Swiss-Prot record:
BP GO annotations: chloroplast organization; leaf development; plant ovule development
Entry protein name: Chloroplast protein FOR GROWTH AND FERTILITY 1
Segments for region (Disordered): 1-30, 62-90
The entry's keywords: Chloroplast, Membrane, Plastid, Transit peptide, Transmembrane, Transmembrane helix
Length: 365
């Protein structure tokens, strides 16, 4: 030991002679108690420090207790290292704990959502069901209004309808004329329904062209018959007697003696005329749209309201004619007879035109 330490001491003794005026802080300082040097950057000091560390680790015979303590400390260090947990194991524990927390939080959210749905279902279900009902109701209501308007237009746009109803409603009161038009409209609807059912049952076996040809001829003949009956009724109206004398009492008695004109009867003939006019291929305009609608409810609503619109339109038309003729009767003498003659001649002319026009290559119906 002393030999190994002598070079370092000699080197330390030489260094002050080289630099007498400066004291270097890098020179090692000797400790009298431990005989060891502070760490320096020179290689000799590294060797001395390694030797001193090795000498401290060598057990001495004179200090058995210290050696035991040192051995125990060195032996106990690996045990302490073994007792330290593995960092990978700690990370796994942390991740498993976080996953459990996430699972618990997810389960809590699901439970809260289920409870909220159960609580809000009685509040949200009726409005949703009501909106669905509103949509369905609006669908069949739209179909119903469409059918009603189609029935009204079909009635008022047909010249045969107007020509056939005018002679029957002139000379009547407003309510009687409305009843005539409604009865004629019911017959027209019955004819359309019959033709629609025949079309659905027979389909390909039903020759539409043949039916249209003969139906057009029958409609023309019915118009001629209605016109002829109107002329007959107009000719039966008695002419007012002309008083030659200016006796007021005589004129009054003659007016009282005048027979009242016969009122036209509302019966089966009016209904049958409507049925004949309804047995036409134009009845398909109520069958085909009803079949093309998306639901049976919408189709039924269209069909029913078409028939109702036809009856209402015809009743309104005849009521208007009857009220006008009744109002003019009080102001213009013999206006009822004149209107009956005009309407009857129009019906006869239209009927003849419908019958004869196909022979000239065109059709008026």
């Amino acid at each position: 030991m002393e030999r190994l330490l002598q070079p370092s001491s000699s080197s330390s003794s030489i260094s002050p002679s080289k630099f007498p005026s400066r004291t270097s802080p890098f020179l090692p300082r000797l400790r009298s108690s431990g005989l060891s040097f502070v760490s320096t950057h020179r290689p000799e000091s590294r060797r001395v420090s390694s030797i001193s560390c090795n000498s401290s680790q060598i057990p001495s015979l004179y200090t058995p207790i210290g050696s035991n303590t040192t051995n125990n400390s060195f032996n106990g260090s690996p045990k302490s290292d073994e007792s330290k947990p593995n960092p990978g194991f700690l990370t796994r524990i942390a991740t498993s704990a976080s996953e459990q927390r996430k699972t618990l939080s997810t389960g809590t959210v699901i439970l809260i959502s289920a409870v909220a749905v159960l609580l809000l279902n009685p509040l949200l279900a009726p409005p949703a069901f009501a909106s669905f009902q509103t949509a369905a109701k609006s669908g069949w209501l739209t179909s119903a209004w469409t059918g009603f308007l189609a029935g009204c237009l079909h009635t008022l746009s047909g010249p045969d309808h107007l020509a056939a109803l005018a002679p029957l409603s002139i000379g009547r009161s407003k309510m009687e004329s409305a009843a005539v038009g409604a009865l004629w409209g019911c017959g027209h609807d019955a004819g359309q329904v019959i033709f629609g059912l025949l079309f659905l049952l027979l389909k390909d076996r039903l020759h539409i062209e043949v039916l249209q040809t003969w139906g057009t001829r029958i409609v023309g003949l019915t118009l001629v018959i209605i016109g002829a009956m109107g002329i007959k009724e107009a000719s039966e109206i008695p002419e007012p007697c002309v008083a030659l004398e200016t006796d007021i009492s005589m004129v009054s008695t003659e007016k009282e003696a005048l027979p009242l004109p016969k009122k036209k009867k509302i019966g089966f003939a009016t209904f049958a005329t409507g049925v004949v006019h309804g047995l036409q291929p134009d009845a398909l305009m109520i069958v085909l749209p009803a079949l093309a609608l998306p639901s049976r409810l919408a189709g039924s609503a269209f069909l029913i309201m078409f028939l109702v619109g036809t009856v209402i339109a015809m009743g309104s038309y005849t009521a208007f004619i009857g009220s006008c003729s009744e109002a003019l009767k009080e102001k213009v003498p013999r206006i009822t007879e004149k209107l009956t003659w005009v309407s009857s001649l129009v019906a006869i002319g239209l009927g003849l035109g419908i019958v004869i026009s196909p022979f000239f290559g065109f059709s008026l119906y």
